[in-house]
Amino acid sequence: MKSPMNRLGIRPGFNKDDFKLIAQGGFGDGMNAYAHSMAWFNGHLYVATTRGNFPLMKARLPIGMDVWPVECPENPFSLDLQAEIWRYTVADDSWERVSKAPLIIGSHGKPITRELGYRGMVVYQPKPSDTPMLFVSTWSPAKGPGPLLLRSVDGRNFEPSCEPGLVGLPVTTIRTMVPFKGRLFTTPAGSRGGNTNVSAHSVVYESRDPANGQWEPVSDFGFGEAGNKTIFEMAGFEDHLYVGTFNLEGFQVWRSTVESKPPYQWEKIIDRGAYRGGLNQCVLSMYPFKGALYIGGGIQGGGVDTQNRVGPAPPELLRILPDGSWDLLVGEGRDTPVGRKEPLSGYLPGFDNFFCGYFWRMCAHDGWLYMGTFEWSSVLGYANRARWPEVFTGIINHLSPQSVLDNQSGFSLYRSHDGENWVPVTTNGMDNPYNMGLRTLVSSPQGLFIGTANPFGPKYMPLNGTRYIPNPRGGCEVFLAQGNAA
């Protein structure tokens, strides 16, 4: 049921109290850390997880922690890291696990999960008369065969639709998939070196027959610019496919009508992170809304790129108009080659929240644009600050980590009716400080679903604690706002 319009002719958006918790504790297993992808398909909600994010981070990334928030064995693969797909039925408020990644023999000759997680999920139906298909993009361990695109027509059986690595590429993960003009587009996102965000193959791929694994490249490597380390996000908007990159000098945004013969002609719309530079490192989210394409930025690693010594810095929000011009909505005012840009919302980067690392996902529902963030203050009390910038530690060292956790931590969810005026729905992870990020949002006939990133399970080390104890608030969560908005 839709809510009535107000005197301004606007249907009210959802508030915090409209959201009901429908899954918690990682579906009963705190190892399910991220509700990493989500889709509405054939009358059900599908949610796919990534497991054991903190143990995997410790094993592969140079992140300085005095103590890790959760138990991290020396070999993370001694844990159950087999990613899962869950299905929700609204009518009886029930969940069913419909898929679990199989164990295979890795390149080291030992059993290993085929998938650590599922970073993308999309419904593809090229023609109204065609049977809709659910595609899921996977994250493969480095000693696995490579990422796959899984395909299902019934929501229960998920079969590989391509060869490992999409077309045999030496990569570990595929993040984004976009149906556009009757075709499916995707791109690799991770390398064998352990970084899930930097690809050795920054190319857009297209398929007119993804069910049979027929893929071809339709762009030059990095659009001809070596600084584009990865094509990170894509979206269709009006007549163009838009692509956002990962670039240490600042992300770029390119677009193409994807017509004629590939490789298609591509036009650069935004350069050098909209002239903010490296603090706008990558495009995390893209979403079309009321005649514009909205662009959410960020810095890999949750806003602090320790590998490249970038950040910490909160993200900006932009929007691109059909003529290729752009507005700064949330961010730092500055002079640019296309004139002075001031944030039209009045908000500084991160909605005035220094600990905001990403503008992670966006979704339109019932006339409102909803935006979820990633917020990293929950790890502040565990981090080794020896290599942090002096200016930064001079501020942080005056803060109590417990006070920050109690009063600051948790993702934010904002909504806007016009892209310029933003209203907070929650700024504390829906009352759970361990909900670091809002990773998934899906609009459906039943309402708006949101899924969280919460790697603080199944056991965690309390701040100033001496041992790991069960965390009833650890593991990903899913919420539904249904019926009339408050």
Regions from the PLM with identified roles:
Residues P126-K127:
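Calcium-coordinating acidic loop motifs
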